[in-house]
Amino acid sequence: MAKVQLSPKEITLFRTALKCYETKQYKKGLKAIEPLLERHPEHGESLAIKGILLHSLGNTKEGYDNVRLGLRNDVGSGVCWHIFGLISRADKDYVQAAKCYINAHKLEKNNSSLLRDLALLQSQLRQYKALADTRNALLQDNPGVRANWSALAVAQFLRGEYASAYKIVDAFESTINQGVPVDTQEESEAMLFMNLVILKKDGVEDAYKHLLSIEKKVLDRVAFLETRAEYELYLSKMEEAKSTIYLLLDRNPDNHQYYYNLQRAYGYEDASGKVLDSAEWLNLYSQLAKRYPKSECPTRLPLEKLEGDEFLTHVDLYLRKKLKRGIPSVFVDVKSLYKDTKKCKVVEDLVSKYASSLSTTNKFSEDDDNSQIEIPTTLLWTYYFLAQHFDHVGELEKAEKYVDLAIDHTPTLVELFMTKARISKHKGELQTAMEIMDHARKLDLQDRFINGKCAKYMLRNDENELAAKTVSLFTRNEAVGGAVGDLADMQCLWYMLEDGKSFARQKKFALALKRFSTVFKIFDTWADDQFDFHFFAFRKGSLRTYLDLMSWEDSVYDDPSFREAAQGSIEIYFALFDLPFAKYSPKLPDFEKLSSGEINEEEEKKIYKKLKKDLSKRLERAEKLKEADKSRAKSEDGMPVKYDEDPLGENLVATSEPLKEAQKCLEKLLPYGDKNPSAYILAAQLYTRLKNFDTASKYLEQAKVILGQNDPTVISTEKFYNSIKTQSN
């Protein structure tokens, strides 16, 4: 097709529309482009501009149609390809966007902004080889900008080409040595990055020498000292390591790792953590306690390794000090010692004696002199400790006894009722636990933590509406979606997860999927948030932080909250596939009747009629909620009003392909299957339902390797697999 030639007036209209897009005046931009398209309805670039304006106004399908039509009419236009890339990028389709930018750059080789955007996409997609080529092209275009050198060096580092990364950083550093002005913060970060490159390229010894040579240039003293201490320990330069670690402790005497490293530097502990000289080791901590009197570490850390009478002596002093001061978190502090059952018993006997003596003599021990009389609250915190202790070890009757004694002593302390509620929860008394936690909440209505804890107990008791009403005391209830919508905006993972699990227990699958999908969106947002940093990090010179970010983002979905939401969703999709009536979200009694298969046809018809009626009511309610959200949503100039199209999740549960949806959830779990073998179990169950028995068998075998042949989930999945396979044959 011959390319349309625009008149000067038409070119002005085109530029006006483009300017309107850049300034977010989308409706005005459409008015500018329409007259041009009336005269030239097949002008590709104008169609593409119209498409991106419509897309920006929320008309996604029409926007894509116009862009694709424009591209078809003018496939040789870099503008059309660029616009297609922009809308693909806006919709998080980074693979398609990268292809579009590559095509656009082929047609506009002098457009460096295309290369910059392409580099961001390649970083997001972890296409490191292609990224290195793109960063190199940007460097050739503008070698005077430090960010271009840094970006190329990092790209080479990420693809494992450490020698190339070193050459690039070294080449730029040589220009600085010739008198080129430099930002000291950027230079400091570049030096530490270069040291990391040398470590990967040449090993610890060369990295240590380089680190010492750049000491005066490094502004991040903590990073410098930590790295130096690490190298000195590795190279067995123990005297130097001691000096370095003491400098770190002087800065932060509450960092546990510094103490562990100091033990190694003195030779009192090996790399595995085993104490080699207990007397000298204990003396070291005694000296450290005098040197850092405000830090708890020198008195707390020895408790991890001490045994027998020495442990008894030191834990006695430690607990007395904490209970005297009335520190509520003392049990949380010491419960890690309970991994050793002997230490657990020592602590139990010791604190039980405290309680007995304090209740009669106001002293920790009857052998203490009269100058050691304790204030009344010491007994309170001792009872509180014992309540938590016995709850932790599963002796719930004793736990309840001590928490009641504490409440009798001080009936207005919130923490006591929280512990009493937890004990009731562990006894399986969810209603009682919820009521006690609500009483605790009412003792301090200004405390957001106890409000959230109470809501959590309500959700565990399947009181969803009451929980939402409770958290609404601390949310913006005028937000779209009300209190729950505001919690979603605040990325409140725990609430969405607990709410979803509660709805799943009640077989309200639509709402359960809705909450789990909110969890997915939060994690997707975190994954997408890195996009801007692919540019920003190099502008600021934060190279090491950027590498940490990339490492964290690589495992962003390896998170317990995401795992629970994904597994919950997959199990619901399995139910939707296995039980067609599940899409109606029947109440538990009806769900059990229908799934039992023991009801007659007439009763089944009655239940289905009721389910359809309930569904109709829910759909009406969903429409009302959408209208309410529309009235609450504020429209920005030229921007579409944002509200939830599916507030109750009915669209999610109505899917015609539940196994396909389950597969989408599973794809993000499987990369971490070795750490989370339940992903392999779910995969085996999914592919069994799909009758892809070879794949199902593969995942079942992987689960067996990790969990063992006798694991209950392995056994049940294997039975399910064999049953379906037999039926298929």
Curated annotation (Swiss-Prot):
Parts of the chain that traverse the membrane: none
GO cellular component annotations of the record: cytoplasm; NatA complex
Subcellular locations according to the entry: Cytoplasm
Source organism superkingdom: Eukaryota
UniProt GO molecular function: acetyltransferase activator activity
Keyword Cytoplasm: yes
Regions annotated as coiled coil: 599-635
Alphabetized Pfam families for the sequence: NatA_aux_su (PF12569)
Record field: compositional bias (Basic and acidic residues): 626-645
Main location, first listed in the record: cytoplasm
Disulfide bonds: none
Matching InterPro entries: NatA_aux_su, TPR-like_helical_dom_sf, TPR_rpt
Name of the protein: N-terminal acetyltransferase A complex subunit nat1
